[in-house]
Amino acid sequence: MNIVVEFFVVTFKVLWAFVLAAARWLVRPKEKSVAGQVCLITGAGSGLGRLFALEFARRRALLVLWDINTQSNEETAGMVRHIYRDLEAADAAALQAGKGEEEILPPCNLQVFTYTCDVGKRENVYLTAERVRKEVGEVSVLVNNAGVVSGHHLLECPDELIERTMMVNCHAHFWTTKAFLPTMLEINHGHIVTVASSLGLFSTAGVEDYCASKFGVVGFHESLSHELKAAEKDGIKTTLVCPYLVDTGMFRGCRIRKEIEPFLPPLKPDYCVKQAMRAILTDQPMVCTPRLMYIVTFMKSILPFEAVVCMYRFLGADKCMYPFIAQRKQATNNNEAKNGI
């Protein structure tokens, strides 16, 4: 094709992409079904991972839950089984009420499987993934959610904690994707969800290791998405989830300027997951929560660095992590004193 003609074709496609994006904001797209599909969630024992598990259970997915904490993972599984029982009871009641079978969702083998896995250890991931393939089947939806935070200033943070943060928050995404992507490529079907953070799009002081891990996983996700497009594997979808501070306790103590905080409070975990689920089930490539994060990210990319610093100071975002770090340090000192260290 002549380059001039191709240029106008590309221009039209770019403008059309803007039209489609605007339409998605105005008209909610229809959600796809994940009923009967195998959905694997890392870090499922608590926080967002647990809530993701409950949301996928309500949509009749077959769940595979990974967490390093066996007890909390089993607690999540118990909640999932309770949802499954309610769904089965509702289906039975609907049949007794005389509803046609076509009005009831098709029956699925509703099961939940739990695995204790440290996603920060490559061999552990590969071995557990092999067990999943043998005991459950191939994974259709992969939700890379597991995450940790050290809570130390850079010069006070032990090297081992820095490495741990990078392994769990970033490297683990490589290992899980390498484990389950090959089959997705073979059948050209699947969905990979990357739970990152707004701190993977812009940073702040005091969490260098966490920001580096989240920036890294955002880059990984974007490159993977481009690779799938280049391979014309349009049946494999990807969704990048970048929430603002979520009130799960992970960053307890983090505070922005008190006059600003009522307008930008920590997100409720339920709200965050529901927004992410909407994006996943409508094949949205990326979701930032709240939407203000899109503007912040855009401003950061066009403003001079000193202008960004001024904005951070005005919002109280420049040292927002300091109270959180101080609380972590105090808790560590208390534990050491309690244990006689």
UniProtKB/Swiss-Prot annotation:
EC annotation? Answer: 1.1.1.300
Topology versus the membrane: Single-pass membrane protein
- The enzyme's main class, written as a single word, is oxidoreductase
- Organism annotation: Mus musculus
Q: Which UniProt keywords apply?
A: Endoplasmic reticulum, Lipid metabolism, Membrane, Microsome, NADP, Oxidoreductase, Signal-anchor, Transmembrane, Transmembrane helix
Q: What is its main location?
A: membrane
* Matches recorded under InterPro entries: NAD(P)-bd_dom_sf (IPR036291), Sc_DH/Rdtase_CS (IPR020904), SDR_fam (IPR002347)
The processes (GO biological process) annotated in the record are:
animal organ morphogenesis; bud elongation involved in lung branching; ear development; embryonic camera-type eye development; embryonic forelimb morphogenesis; embryonic organ development; embryonic viscerocranium morphogenesis; gonad development
Q: Where is the active site?
A: Y210
Q: What name is this protein filed under?
A: Retinol dehydrogenase 10
Function of the molecule: Retinol dehydrogenase with a clear preference for NADP. Converts all-trans-retinol to all-trans-retinal. Has no detectable activity towards 11-cis-retinol, 9-cis-retinol and 13-cis-retinol. Required for normal embryonic development.
